[in-house]
């Protein structure tokens, strides 16, 4: 039976690699298939409730993408080193949750190049490919290094971003497809320019800790978009709790409507009413 309406706490969009990416919206206990709603009128209404995605308590404000303030201050997944992995302090025995750190940070990470709104460098756990690329709305992506820990991947990223961006311009992302980039050539250029720095990191952590991926292939990703927005305007459910319009596309964590665009991940843990007409 086709989805008509529902209400619940939301999580980030789930995107499965396909031609194009196949999206769904976690809404309470259900997952709303989104691709089939392209061209339909959808309505999202913030119901004035936010429940922490970790402990479930009600909170007036969302911290660290869906947490309450107490959880934000105590969870390792909300620490500053998640945003700045080179600042990892696990080896100082000050990790908020050492067991969590063992599982999520002391594991193989991939340093990659992507083309979203232009060339950028990024990192992710090896198990999060291609999810990370889809979440960022990348049209092309290429793994370039396999690194032993999150901290080490952050140090490599810090080295490479001296010559390439590490951020995505969301407006450019939603205005259209980026011009294709020769990611293999960019990989060779960037790694060549960072050779001395990479060798220093290998000397510090061991040769096997930072390994190039010369045989990796470029992944092309296509998104379900009927029409891009020439001048994307971002919806703010905090100020205007109702957003309604024709769904024209889905890219990264954004829904593109003819009235505005909305970053769904920004509203993680918000209770929304979602309907289709």
List PLM regions with ranges.
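Non-catalytic accessory segments flanking enzymatic or RNA/DNA-binding domains
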Residues: 1-277
